[in-house]
């Protein structure tokens, strides 16, 4: 159970956390990460909203099998998506560091 002062402190922390989350979400939306496949022969760059910004294909792949190129493009996109998700989790978990949250309370990411 929370005391009056404890509840007020928790509300203050929640407001601070909300402000930090908004700032971090704005930062993440502006970020870009690049995923790679085929040892860097295919690169896909996405932003924090998971929108594809650029696809780069090494010219040596253009004469190869179409199916392989498609697979590498998909793998590069998946790599980029995984990377931006890791950045999001890391930045969002940093927000709650130092907060005295109730046991079992998790911040949704």
From Swiss-Prot:
<dbReference type="GO" id="GO:0043590">
    <property type="term" value="C:bacterial nucleoid"/>
</dbReference>
<dbReference type="GO" id="GO:0005829">
    <property type="term" value="C:cytosol"/>
</dbReference>
<protein>
    <recommendedName>
        <fullName>Nucleoid-associated protein BUsg_467</fullName>
    </recommendedName>
</protein>
<keyword id="KW-0963">Cytoplasm</keyword>
<dbReference type="Pfam" id="PF02575">
    <property type="entry name" value="YbaB_DNA_bd"/>
</dbReference>
<comment type="similarity">
    <text>Belongs to the YbaB/EbfC family.</text>
</comment>
<dbReference type="GO" id="GO:0003677">
    <property type="term" value="F:DNA binding"/>
</dbReference>
<keyword id="KW-0238">DNA-binding</keyword>
<dbReference type="InterPro" id="IPR004401">
    <property type="entry name" value="YbaB/EbfC"/>
</dbReference>
<dbReference type="InterPro" id="IPR036894">
    <property type="entry name" value="YbaB-like_sf"/>
</dbReference>
<comment type="subunit">
    <text>Homodimer.</text>
</comment>
<comment type="function">
    <text>Binds to DNA and alters its conformation. May be involved in regulation of gene expression, nucleoid organization and DNA protection.</text>
</comment>
């Amino acid at each position: 159970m929370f005391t009056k002062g404890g509840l007020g402190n928790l509300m203050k922390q929640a407001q601070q956390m909300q402000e930090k989350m908004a700032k971090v979400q704005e930062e993440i939306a502006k970020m870009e990460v690049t995923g790679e496949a085929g040892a860097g022969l295919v690169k896909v760059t996405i932003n924090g909203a998971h929108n594809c910004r650029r696809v780069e294909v090494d010219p040596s792949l253009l004469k190869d099998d179409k199916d392989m190129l498609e697979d590498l493009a998909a793998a590069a996109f998946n790599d980029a998506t995984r990377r931006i998700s890791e950045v999001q989790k890391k930045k969002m978990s940093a927000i709650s560091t130092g907060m005295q949250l109730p046991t079992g309370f998790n911040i949704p990411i």
